[in-house]
Structure formats: structure tokens, C-alpha cells
């Protein structure tokens, strides 16, 4: 590292990074899953955490595909005495035999601990709200945008043969008021056409639905309610409303029970949309009989919410939404060059023309996708909602792929990679509450019944009803490391904010529970007899044998133990026996850092002669979790500065390929690789993978698909894309306890020259600091402005990738 100190803090005016928008000159379509017109390939997504909406359809029959976070089949709403997959009595007596066979042979089976996914359930769509306009079958000058500066979806068009009849609609979902709002407006003095509203879901048994219409001077509202099954037991209840704001200024008429017509309206029409279920996350415990049920009728709940919102009027609702949205979105921005006037073009055109073969990519589009990822997180995860699931908050189906659940062996983690560094830490409150309310209670049972362990545990696939046990196949279901990986997010949230009150009240209890589980589950290695502590049994996520000492698990437990000990500076744990046990176990823990005969990192502790640690192109990079997004290797083992480890990571990534193997061609596999290359300071390979992900997996509406450009839609790659971009902008690792001196943060470790002349604003650093910085045409950071200094006790040095010291604090 060069010691020359230069490049002082500089501040200059920047354009508004949040002025970017998704654009289209044609309406979104519903289509079919195997067609290019599929709704999740054409629609732009909006939401407020609890509610998710996809507007689609032509202007004469614009539809709002409506989702509510907790609308699920399965669980206690499908079967009496739902157990979350747990057995009715302990089965841990099988563990000693399982472990003995594995230590004796290197691998083995564990069928005795497997369960089933019966009554697991699935996230499901609520329905479509149709807003039909009379006499608008033919139209021109159609435009559709999702403005990422305010989160408002807008359309505009002109009715054919009526040159003065230009109409525009605006749709947004408000977190402050817990509703979505549809607003129709005439650009002239002409009256609005006759409007008819209806709510339907043709996918469900119609006998389970009920609609009603109310049309009075004081209130005009369409109500829709249903239940997921007739029972017994009775299924989950849900309800939706569409309410006209200020009905006195129009003539409203009920067309039977299923439609509401509005006529003689002047220039504007506003419709409030709300939805709710009788799911209660706080009732997922023994005290509540594991019911997850709210005794209140969701119809009355949503009716009250919509009525209260309606009294505020459109402008106040919009102002409150925009203020809340900008508070989260406006505090971070990335500014990359737009050398091809991409800002004025349809997003689908930009993506269609994007080519991996072009080494310069399209920086504007790459910037747009990062902004869209932040929008999607704000729209699908807020403090009073469930976390973002496999599809965020959006599905058009009753049975989306993998139930649109929570897969916790990369997908859920990737959803939140971008949160802490870009000022969206608030979105993670949904995650902490979900884990505390639904994972911990049942997971404590699972730990006891399956492992005879203290603490709590979950496995790979988790629903909203506390399914914490294993499903049927050890290859993917045997994954008790899920919560250990999630503890990285818990610690990072504290490390970036230094919110000690939160750590004391919620975060540390989660960490302690997982550390306790592993303290009572780790085994002394009887295969190598080296005295180390290892996991037995374990499966590396979705690949390889059931064995012991899987690299992935060992790295994650290493992180858990290290962060529990680091937390003592702020917690002052009274249970000194627990702290001593963690410290003692950490001294003996195999930390999962072993090199293979061909130079890569080993995925299994087994000798190479067993044939598992070959040059696999598998989609997962599980044995690199401690490199990125974690830091067991990159920080605690000093790997970021160690050439031997760097070379091993490089060999592993090279062998693993581009993320397009026969087992999957998923976007998330590619962006994970991009992030790992970035942590190697390799801008060329990081940018290659990022471009390849866009070219292969991203479709015309900016979403990423799983099988190349074919469904299913998985939102993790959208979020992971942003995480990869951030890893190209900064390497900011936690300080190892063994090295408490000055911490070095590298700004711009892997910025490609295609992004030359760009800048970032509002990037968060560990310890609570916030910085703005920019770089030259080569991608080398040449100025930094410290906007906010951190609360942490360690000193921080900011350098660029050439080793120049930019600032110290």
C-alpha cells in the first residue's frame, strides 16, 4: 500500500440520482407464464410492505393485481394441531448412531430425522381490481412509467377521435396510510368517462368468495372477502375494498353486488384500495395455541383503514406517501454515466439490446437496476409487514414456484444484502420480527425434538406459520445452518448503525439462541481425530453427501461465535458461563478453511480422495459464504490481504463457472459470483458476471428470471444485483477481535472503467459513518466527503484500490 496521502474531501452539486424511471410505450399484459407477455415480465411492481400491486392491461380495462403479505394457504388454517413440521415426540435418539456412522465412513444417511412438507402451504394472490373506462377502446400516445424518485406508477394516453381527451392515471401504495391509491385525471376540462370498478379472482372456488357494493351519498365502496378453505378447520379469512373518495362529486351506482359504477365525474377520481387477512404473526407460539389467528374480522379492519385514508383526500395521501418514500430512497444514490441517452428509452428496449459481449455494458441501465432493487425492497419489506419472500410481495398465482416462501440457504439472505449500506436498515425490522415471532418459538421445539439441543434452529424452507423442521430430502432439507447465516444480518445491522438499544432488546437474544444451539450440537471430530469441533451431520446446500465438517457450516458458526463475543462490549452479558463456553468452543472450532489438491477452497472436510471436492459448476457458492457476503475468511482469517487465500478463492470461482450450468441458469448465482470477484478487487470479472446476469436473466420490466429469461421470477437476483454493485463500490469488513487496531475501508475496489467519472452519495460504513465519493475515468476513487462520522470506537482509514489514503477518521 502506498503511503502518500492525497485527495481531500470534495463536495460538488450532483444531479438527482432518483430521477430514473422504468418506461414503456405499451401496457403491461397478463399473458401466460411461458410467453413474453407474462405479467411478471411486463408489469412494474409497487407496494407498501403489506400490500403489493402490479398494474396491467390497456387503458379501457386497467387492472391492479393485488397481493397481501400474509395471504397463504396451509398451516393451522388448513389442518388442526399444525406442528410446523415437528414430530409429536423426540427423535434425537437416532443422532448418536447417525454421527457414529458418518465419522466411521465419512458419509452416511440421516433418514430418521427427515420430515415432510405436509400442509406447508403457499403464498397466493388475492385477486384483480378492474377499473373499466367507457368509450376508451381506442387510444394513442400511451406512456407508462414507474418513477423511482417517488414510487408512483403513472400512465397517460389520449382517447382516439377526442384530441382534447387526454387522461392520466397514477397508482401508489402508501406505507403511512396502509392503502394503495388509484387516481384518474383528465388533462382538460372534459368530464371523465364513465368508470366501473370490480374485484374478482377467477382462480379460486367462487363459493368461497363474497362481494358486496355500497353506494350512498357519504360512501361508495366495493367489498370483496373470502376464505382459503371451507374447513374444518376454517381457512384464512381475507378481505379487500375499493372505495371512492368524495362520492358526492359524482353519481355512483351499484351494478349488482359485484361492480360499482361512477359517472358524471368532473376532472378527477380517486379510489382507495385496502386488503387484510386474519393472520397474526404474534400468535405463533404455545401461549396462543400456535393459531396465528387474529380474532378480529379482516373485513372490518380493512374497511376502517380505507375509510380513514379516504378522508385525507388524494393530495394529502400522495404527499404523505412521497415524504415517506423519499426518506428511505433519497438518502443514497449512485451516479453512472448515460452516454447513449438511455434515460429517454423504453426499459424493455434497453434490456433487449443489452449484450454481454459489449465490454462497456450500459451504465445507465445498471444504475437503473440498482435503483429498482432499492424500490422493490422498500415496497416489499416494512416494519409492520412480513419480510420480502422469494417473489418479494408479488404473485399472480395460487401456487407460485417454491410457494414463494422463505428459502434460507442464500435467497432470503440475498434479499437484504443491499439494506444496511444504502440506508434501508428500516426494511429489516420485518425480518427481525418475523424471526423472533415465528422462527424462535417453533425452532426451540425443533432444536429439542430433533437434536436434544438448547437454543433454536430452522432449516432451508420456512413458511409464515413457523415451519422450522426438515422436509423430505437431506440433500436440500438438512440445513440447520440457516439461522446461523441469518445472524450475519443481525450483527451487520448493529455494526452499521451501532443501535445498542436494538441489540439489547432484540438482536442479541437472536444471536445468543443460535450460539446456544451450536454449543450443544457441535461434535469433536472423530474422523481426523484432530480435536476440532465440527457439525455432524451436515449437507452443503443442495449438493454433495451427508457428512461432517461442511465448510459452509463451519464458517457461519465461526461468525456467530465471533460476533457474540464482540457484542459483549455493548451487552455486558450476566451469563458468564455462556460467554466462556463460546470462547472455549471458538478456540477448538474448525473454521472451514481448507485447500483442495487443485488449489481451490474445499467444500467438505473429507479428504479429496473421496471425490467430492472436484471442479464443480454447481450454482451455489456455499463454501465461499465466509468470503462474501460473510467475513469468516475475508476478515477473521485475514483472507482479503492474504495472497494464498485470494488465489484459492479465485481458483474456486474459476472452477465454479459463470453460474449457467445444467443444474440452473439463475440470476442469483451470477450476481453472487460478481460480488465474490469484486471482493478480490477484480473489476473485470465482477463486471463480466454482472453484465452476464443482465443479458441472461433480466427481462423487459427489469425483473430477473430463474431459467435464463424464463420463469419463475425470483426477486433475490434483483436484490443481489444491488449487493454486487455495492461490493464493487466498497470493501468494508468488520474488525477481527484479534486485530482491534485501525480498520481499513477500500473505496472502489472493483469499479470498471465503463463507470468512469461516476460517484456515490450516502454510502453507509460500519460504525455508523456515511460518505460521498467519486472516481476518475479509470474507476479509481479520487475524492471522498465524510458526511457523518461513525459511533464505533475503532479508527478508520479510507483508501482507494491503488492504496492511496483518501481520509482517516
UniProtKB/Swiss-Prot annotation:
Annotated GO MF terms: alpha-L-fucosidase activity
Known glycosylation sites: 81, 105, 128, 161, 205, 452, 614, 642, 681
Keywords from the UniProt entry: Carbohydrate metabolism, Glycoprotein, Glycosidase, Hydrolase, Polysaccharide degradation, Secreted, Signal
GO CC entries: extracellular region
Annotated signal sequence range: 1-19
Subcellular localization(s) per the UniProt record: Secreted
Annotated SUPFAM superfamilies: Six-hairpin glycosidases
Leading EC class: hydrolase
Keyword Lipoprotein found: no
Similarity comment: family membership: Belongs to the glycosyl hydrolase 95 family.
Protein name stated in the entry: Alpha-fucosidase A
Gene: afcA
Amino acid at each position: 500500500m502506498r503511503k502518500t496521502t492525497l485527495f481531500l474531501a470534495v463536495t460538488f452539486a450532483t444531479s438527482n440520482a432518483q430521477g430514473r424511471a422504468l418506461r414503456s410505450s405499451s401496457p403491461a399484459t397478463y399473458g401466460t407464464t411461458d410467453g413474453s407477455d407474462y405479467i411478471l415480465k411486463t408489469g412494474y411492481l409497487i407496494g407498501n410492505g403489506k400490500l403489493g400491486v402490479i398494474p396491467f392491461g390497456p387503458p379501457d380495462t386497467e387492472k391492479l393485481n393485488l397481493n397481501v403479505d400474509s395471504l397463504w394457504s396451509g398451516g393451522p388454517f388448513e389442518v388442526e394441531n399444525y406442528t410446523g413440521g415437528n414430530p409429536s415426540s423426540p427423535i434425537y435418539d437416532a443422532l448418536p448412531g447417525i454421527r457414529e456412522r458418518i465419522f466411521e465412513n465419512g458419509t452416511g444417511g440421516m433418514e430418521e430425522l427427515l420430515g415432510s412438507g405436509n400442509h406447508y402451504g403457499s403464498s397466493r394472490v388475492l385477486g384483480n381490481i378492474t377499473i373499466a373506462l367507457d368509450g376508451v377502446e381506442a387510444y394513442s400516445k400511451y406512456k407508462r412509467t414507474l418513477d423511482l424518485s417517488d414510487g408512483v406508477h403513472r400512465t397517460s394516453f389520449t382517447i382516439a377521435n377526442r384530441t382534447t381527451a387526454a387522461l392520466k392515471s397514477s397508482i401508489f401504495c402508501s406505507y403511512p396510510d396502509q392503502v394503495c391509491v388509484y387516481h384518474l385525471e383528465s388533462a382538460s376540462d372534459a368530464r371523465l368517462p364513465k368508470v366501473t370498478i370490480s374485484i374478482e379472482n377467477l382462480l379460486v372456488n367462487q363459493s368461497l368468495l363474497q362481494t358486496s357494493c355500497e353506494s350512498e351519498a357519504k360512501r361508495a365502496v366495493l367489498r370483496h372477502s373470502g376464505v382459503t378453505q371451507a374447513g374444518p378447520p376454517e381457512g384464512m379469512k381475507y378481505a379487500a375494498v375499493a372505495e371512492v373518495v368524495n362520492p358526492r362529486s359524482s353519481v355512483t351506482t351499484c351494478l349488482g353486488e359485484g361492480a360499482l359504477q361512477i359517472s358524471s365525474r368532473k376532472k378527477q377520481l380517486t379510489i382507495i384500495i385496502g386488503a387484510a387477512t386474519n393472520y397474526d404473526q404474534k400468535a405463533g407460539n404455545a401461549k396462543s395455541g400456535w393459531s396465528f389467528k387474529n380474532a378480529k374480522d379482516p373485513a372490518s379492519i380493512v374497511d376502517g383503514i380505507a375509510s380513514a385514508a379516504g378522508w385525507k383526500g388524494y393530495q394529502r395521501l400522495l404527499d404523505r406517501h412521497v415524504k415517506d418514500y423519499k426518506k428511505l430512497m433519497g438518502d443514497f444514490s449512485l451516479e453512472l454515466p448515460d452516454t447513449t441517452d438511455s434515460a429517454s428509452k423504453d426499459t424493455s428496449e434497453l434490456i433487449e439490446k443489452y449484450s454481454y459481449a459489449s465490454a462497456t455494458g450500459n451504465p445507465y441501465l445498471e444504475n437503473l437496476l440498482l435503483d429498482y432493487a432499492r424500490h422493490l425492497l422498500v415496497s416489499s419489506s416494512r416494519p409492520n409487514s412480513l419480510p420480502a419472500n422469494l417473489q418479494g410481495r408479488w404473485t399472480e398465482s395460487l401456487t407460485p414456484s417454491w410457494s414463494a416462501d422463505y428459502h434460507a440457504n442464500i435467497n432470503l439472505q440475498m434479499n437484504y444484502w443491499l439494506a444496511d449500506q444504502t440506508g434501508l436498515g428500516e426494511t429489516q425490522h420485518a425480518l427481525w420480527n418475523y424471526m423472533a415471532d415465528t422462527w424462535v418459538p417453533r425452532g426451540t421445539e425443533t432444536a429439542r425434538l430433533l437434536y436434544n439441543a438448547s437454543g433454536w434452529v430452522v432449516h432451508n424452507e420456512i413458511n409464515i406459520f413457523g415451519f422450522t423442521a426438515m422436509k423430505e430430502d437431506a440433500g436440500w432439507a438438512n440445513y440447520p445452518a440457516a439461522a446461523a447465516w441469518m445472524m450475519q444480518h443481525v450483527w451487520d445491522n448493529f455494526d452499521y448503525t451501532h443501535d445498542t438499544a436494538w441489540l439489547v432488546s432484540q438482536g442479541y437474544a437472536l444471536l445468543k439462541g443460535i450460539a446456544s444451539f451450536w454449543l450443544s450440537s457441535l461434535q469433536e471430530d472423530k474422523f481426523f481425530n484432530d480435536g476440532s469441533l465440527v457439525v455432524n451431520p451436515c449437507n452443503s446446500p443442495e449438493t454433495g453427501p451427508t457428512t461432517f465438517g461442511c465448510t459452509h457450516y463451519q464458517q457461519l458458526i465461526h461468525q456467530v461465535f465471533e460476533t457474540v463475543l464482540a457484542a459483549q462490549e455493548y451487552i455486558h452479558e450476566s451469563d458468564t458461563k455462556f460467554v466462556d463456553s463460546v470462547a472455549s468452543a471458538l478456540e477448538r472450532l474448525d473454521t472451514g478453511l481448507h485447500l483442495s489438491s487443485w488449489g481451490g477452497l474445499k467444500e467438505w472436510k473429507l479428504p479429496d480422495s473421496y471425490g467430492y471436492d472436484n471442479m464443480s459448476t454447481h450454482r451455489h457458492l456455499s463454501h465461499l459464504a465466509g468470503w462474501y457476503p460473510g467475513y469468516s475468511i475475508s476478515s477473521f482469517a485475514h483472507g482479503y490481504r492474504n495472497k494464498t487465500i485470494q488465489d484459492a478463492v479465485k481458483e474456486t470461482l474459476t472452477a465454479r463457472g459463470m453460474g449457467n450450468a445444467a443444474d440452473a441458469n439463475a440470476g442469483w448465482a451470477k450476481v453472487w459470483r460478481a460480488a465474490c470477484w469484486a471482493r478480490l478487487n477484480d473489476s473485470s470479472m465482477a463486471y463480466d458476471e454482472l453484465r452476464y446476469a443482465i443479458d441472461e436473466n433480466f427481462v423487459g420490466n427489469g425483473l430477473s428470471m430463474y431459467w435464463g429469461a424464463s420463469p419463475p421470477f425470483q426477486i433475490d437476483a434483483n436484490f443481489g444485483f444491488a449487493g454486487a454493485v455495492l461490493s464493487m463500490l466498497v470493501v468494508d469488513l468488520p474488525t477481527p477481535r484479534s486485530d482491534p487496531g485501525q480498520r481499513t475501508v477500500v473505496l472502489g475496489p472493483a469499479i470498471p472503467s465503463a463507470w468512469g467519472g461516476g460517484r456515490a452519495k450516502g454510502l453507509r460504513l460500519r460504525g455508523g459513518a456515511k460518505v460521498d465519493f467519486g472516481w476518475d475515468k479509470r474507476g479509481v476513487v479520487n475524492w471522498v466527503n465524510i458526511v457523518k462520522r461513525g459511533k464505533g470506537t475503532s479508527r478508520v482509514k479510507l483508501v482507494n484500490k491503488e492504496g492511496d489514503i483518501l481520509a482517516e477518521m
